[in-house]
Amino acid sequence: MKKTGILNSHLAKLADDLGHTDQVCIGDLGLPVPNGIPKIDLSLTSGVPSFQEVLDIYLENILVEKVILAEEIKEANPDQLSRLLAKLDNSVSIEYVSHDHLKQMTQDVKAVIRTGENTPYSNIILQSGVII
């Protein structure tokens, strides 16, 4: 039995299978998941697990070269944005798009991880980097 890292087998496999430029989305309770895109639903109840908890685990286990966020988070959820930005390495590129465009972009991700987060625009697309 694995005792460190990502213990959830679905999340671990997703992280293990990511190649350079592959994308994965971590989303709040309300983010729609396009047909055909795998959804890993971690939500237990409203707020559990939080967006930040899931993001922390993924940032510890994958190399991220770019993140994509909804422009609307800047005004609608600045506390969430501040905490999120504080976790990113200086080398990570940040792109802001409209929330509608971010939802369209989820059609190309490897999977959407649904959290119990109940605050607005708590969604991120992580683009995998390369270690060489």
Curated annotation (Swiss-Prot):
Enzyme Commission code(s) on record: 5.4.99.62
Pfam family, one: RbsD_FucU
InterPro entries the UniProt entry points to: D-ribose_pyranase, RbsD-like_sf, RbsD_FucU
HAMAP family named among the record's database cross-references: D_rib_pyranase
Subunit structure, interactors included: Homodecamer.
Family note: Belongs to the RbsD / FucU family. RbsD subfamily.
Protein name: D-ribose pyranase
Organism whose genome encodes this protein: Streptococcus agalactiae serotype Ia (strain ATCC 27591 / A909 / CDC SS700)
Lineage of the species this protein comes from: Bacteria, Bacillati, Bacillota, Bacilli, Lactobacillales
